[in-house]
């Protein structure tokens, strides 16, 4: 990736998920980022934010946290956000007078939007420069038809975003 600035940027990748295949998806994205040259750029620090819901599909915490060592070694920081972390964030908002009980529950309660909110909250608290949300049901490939043949092609989603915002 080409940038005029050579300063280090902290990039947050946020996944709001409840799907068992999350780790397979994460592996696909990391292979994609390595292929694009993003991994290995000393000026880009990848920070992973995973807000998971164990009740959505009856999953276990390990379905999200068992990241292979080869991938973990490439991540600057990893934040796993489950019900305990959400309760703590709600408590903080109430304790500091930022939100009452009702609004803390609305902001960080249940559902996809609340998961994205808690990821954003964590990203702000951890000085993330850029945050990109990726869906847990979309792989970094696209299928196109060429003369009656389906072609699978990789897309460099994160690289393209950074080229245009960093």
Where do the protein language model's features map onto the residues?
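Short alpha-helical segments and helix-capping/turn motifs at coil-helix boundaries
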Residues: 26-36, 114-120, 155-165
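Residue-level preference for long, well-ordered alpha-helices that form the structural scaffold
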Residues: 22, 108, 154-158
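Conserved donor-nucleotide/metal-binding helix-loop-beta segment in metal-dependent transferases, i.e.
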Residues: 139-166
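Residue-level detection of beta-strand scaffold positions
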Residues: 49-51, 119, 128
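Active-site acidic Asp-centered loop
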Residues: 134-137
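Short aromatic/hydrophobic "clamp" motif used to bind/position activated sugar donors
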Residues: 131
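Active-site-proximal specificity loops/subdomain of glycosyltransferases
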Residues: 57-126
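N-proximal low-complexity "stem/linker" segments adjacent to membrane-targeting elements
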Residues: 1-66, 95-103
């Amino acid at each position: 990736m080409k940038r005029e600035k050579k300063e280090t940027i902290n990039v947050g990748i946020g996944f709001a998920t409840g799907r068992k295949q999350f780790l397979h998806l994460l592996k696909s994205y990391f292979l994609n980022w390595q292929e694009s040259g993003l991994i290995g750029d000393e000026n880009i620090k990848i920070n992973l934010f995973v807000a998971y819901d164990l009740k959505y599909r009856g999953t276990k915490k390990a379905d999200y946290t068992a990241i292979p060592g080869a991938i973990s070694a490439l991540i600057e920081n990893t934040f796993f956000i489950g019900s305990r972390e959400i309760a703590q964030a709600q408590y903080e908002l109430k304790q500091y007078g930022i939100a009452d009980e009702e609004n803390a529950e609305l902001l960080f309660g249940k559902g996809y939007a609340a998961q994205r909110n808690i990821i954003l909250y964590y990203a702000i608290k951890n000085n993330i420069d850029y945050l990109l949300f990726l869906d847990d049901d979309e792989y970094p490939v696209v299928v196109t038809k060429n003369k009656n043949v389906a072609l699978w092609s990789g897309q460099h989603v994160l690289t393209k975003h950074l080229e245009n915002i960093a």
